[in-house]
Amino acid sequence: MEYDAGDSAGAEESSAGGPPGTQYVQSLARGLDVIRAFDAEHPAMTLTDVARRTGLSRATARRFLHTLADLGYVRFDGKLFELTAQVLQLGYSYLSSHTLPQLIEPVLEELSAELNESCSASILDGADVVYIARVHTRRIMRVGIAVGTRFPAYATSMGRVLLAHLAPAELDRALAARPLVPLTPSTIVSEESLRAELAAVRGRGWCFVDQELETGLRSIAVPVFGADGTVQAALNVSTSTPAPSLGTQEEPLATALEMLPRLSAAAERISAALRARR
């Protein structure tokens, strides 16, 4: 949607564009859209780039960018805008006020040490998974992952675990929010096939993804249930495929399933802690 140059960037309240029956601050929503426009593929952008990615006019985008710069969230070198480290404080506010990452991190550290593999936890945000905890091994991984990293849920093991436990209407919205595009030759891009896989994931209680997000990356994930029985997060163990030159023969799923009992036990420890806090 294109907003004309006369649109106000102030803090007016409007129900237009907002959820029906709620108070909606349109200018705040636009400012957050500007922040979200920056990502791994677009770390630094011109004014025109930001306007294009947000659907705002150049005049409106300029006001938001310079406001964010005055507040310390954006820097401008005369040509390109980029986020500053101060943006991390927004995410830290969530992490520091939410008990889930605090419960998960020590469990992941133990699990990673036991398996000598990288372990992660994530939650669902729309059509994406967002990492809320991560423990790395010393192995070199082709995908750079840290707390706050977002990936399309449909192509990840944790994402599929989380999608699989959504109510039907919520799943419909999540799948409609993002097109299924091939990230690797192995990525499932048929909605019918994905829905069938999600049903299978829900039934068996775990998900294995083999090189669908990135070639060479495999992972297995399980859900973490809250005190009310709903899925609060997902845990996974990720591994990289052996280099072809090593001549290693392996059965990927069998290897992943060897780790499943410890992964499931870790998830149950977190679930038990959540139940105890009820």
Please describe what each predicted stretch is.
Residues M1-S97, P101-Q102, E268-A276:
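N-terminal helix-turn-helix
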Residues E2-D7, I140-T215:
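Short, solvent-exposed recognition segments
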Residues R204, Q232-R278:
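Juxtadomain coupling helices with adjacent low-complexity linkers
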Residues R218-V222:
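Short hydrophobic beta-strand micro-motif common in sensory/regulatory domains
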